[in-house]
């Protein structure tokens, strides 16, 4: 039996150093802190960040460390106290919105933790506006749509764009969430097959690893309709080592699509919540989009629905660590401002300490 391990932490014929990337170093520290190796006291954790790699990093992403840096949001990539390195709050959940507006945020009486934005493959982002939002302490959730072909990404023909974007986000510095081609269930066939998506996702992550873009947190963002897609989710999933967060987009479709009944927050979130508990139990969950319209007489109101969502987050949906409301007039009127009661309820839950995480 092996009774001792001595790592060759040096640069010789190859660069074997554990600190070739932030992810590598965090993984090595987690290994060293495992009780199996705890035979002598460990030295204090260094206070400085590791140097960015000068050679390609490993193609896997270790599970984020539970010991965060102490930098506040907007100050260069660290995690504040009370958060893991993957920006998972140790308690409570992050609160966010799409279609950001400062006037509307002022109505809420607090800053949003997350602002959700959407970009195409060749876009240059974060934009100046997005950088300003991040500089004020908000986290960006960026949906990055592929060029229309997952095989083209997976086979390396899009590596130049991946490297360009990875270097830009590395230079940005702050922690951010990046979802590669969200809701891929909608594009199976046109963009490729489920296995192509998983390979493309891994190719993107590997490209970011190569340049040392350690501030980027990768989000696997599904629609979350288990009834129609549950059989393909295992093939779409790129693997735990490539995913920091799992996100899905549940909606209460009553009044927007024919044949849909009124459904509670617990009901719309349950199927995919249960699926992830069985297939990826260690990953934090995010509602990257969710919404409802005003509800019919005799049903719980939109305001009551919001208030109940906070109850569920505290009790039955404790693995959901971030929720981002789809505050848009899109295929339905999902806007919070559909009634004064809706605004008041949404404002009240946002001010609750459970959701008041970053600010």
Regions found by a protein language model. Give the residues of each.
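Active-site groove signature of glycoside hydrolases
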Residues: 5, 165-195, 216-225, 246, ...
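Glycoside hydrolase catalytic-domain groove-lining segments
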Residues: 1-3, 7, 128-145, 251-296
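Aromatic- and acid-rich polysaccharide-binding/catalytic face
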Residues: 8-10, 112, 116-117, 233-263, ...
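Surface-exposed cleft-lining segments at the edges of enzyme active sites
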Residues: 145-156, 183-194, 223-226, 248-265, ...
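N-terminal carbohydrate-binding/catalytic regions of secreted carbohydrate-active enzymes
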Residues: 1-2, 8-33, 87-175, 301-305, ...
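Aromatic-lined carbohydrate-recognition surfaces of secreted/lumenal glycan-active proteins
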Residues: 4-10, 85-86, 97, 205-231, ...
């Amino acid at each position: 039996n092996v009774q001792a391990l001595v790592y060759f932490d040096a640069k010789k014929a190859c660069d074997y150093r554990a600190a070739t990337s932030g992810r590598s170093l965090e993984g090595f520290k987690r290994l060293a802190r495992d009780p199996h190796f705890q035979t002598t006291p460990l030295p204090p954790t260094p206070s400085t960040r590791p140097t960015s790699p000068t050679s390609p990093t490993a193609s896997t992403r270790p599970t984020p460390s539970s010991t965060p840096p102490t930098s506040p949001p907007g100050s260069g990539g660290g995690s504040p106290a009370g958060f893991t390195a993957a920006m998972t709050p140790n308690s409570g959940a992050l609160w966010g919105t799409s279609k950001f507006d400062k006037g509307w945020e002022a109505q809420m009486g607090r800053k949003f933790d997350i602002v959700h934005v959407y970009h195409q493959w060749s876009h240059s982002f974060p934009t100046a506006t997005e950088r300003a939002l991040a500089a004020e302490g908000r986290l960006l959730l960026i949906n990055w749509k592929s060029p229309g072909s997952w095989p083209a990404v997976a086979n390396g023909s899009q590596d130049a764009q991946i490297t360009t974007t990875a270097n830009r986000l590395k230079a940005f510095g702050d922690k951010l969430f990046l979802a590669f081609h969200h809701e891929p269930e909608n594009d199976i066939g046109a963009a490729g097959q489920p296995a192509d998506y998983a390979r493309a996702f891994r190719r993107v992550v590997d490209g970011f690893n190569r340049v040392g873009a350690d501030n980027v947190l990768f989000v696997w963002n599904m629609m979350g309709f288990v009834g129609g897609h549950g059989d393909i989710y295992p093939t779409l999933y790129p693997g735990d080592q490539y995913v920091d967060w799992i996100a899905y987009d549940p909606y209460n479709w009553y009044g927007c699509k024919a044949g849909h009944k009124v459904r509670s927050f617990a009901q719309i979130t349950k199927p995919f919540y249960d699926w992830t508990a069985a297939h990826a139990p260690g990953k934090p969950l995010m509602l990257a989009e969710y919404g409802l319209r005003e509800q019919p007489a005799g049903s719980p109101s939109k305001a009551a629905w919001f208030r109940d969502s906070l109850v569920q987050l505290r009790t039955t949906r404790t693995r959901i660590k971030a929720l981002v409301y789809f505050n848009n007039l899109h295929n339905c009127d999902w806007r919070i401002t559909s009634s004064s009661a809706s605004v008041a309820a949404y404002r009240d839950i946002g001010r609750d300490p459970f959701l008041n995480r970053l600010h």
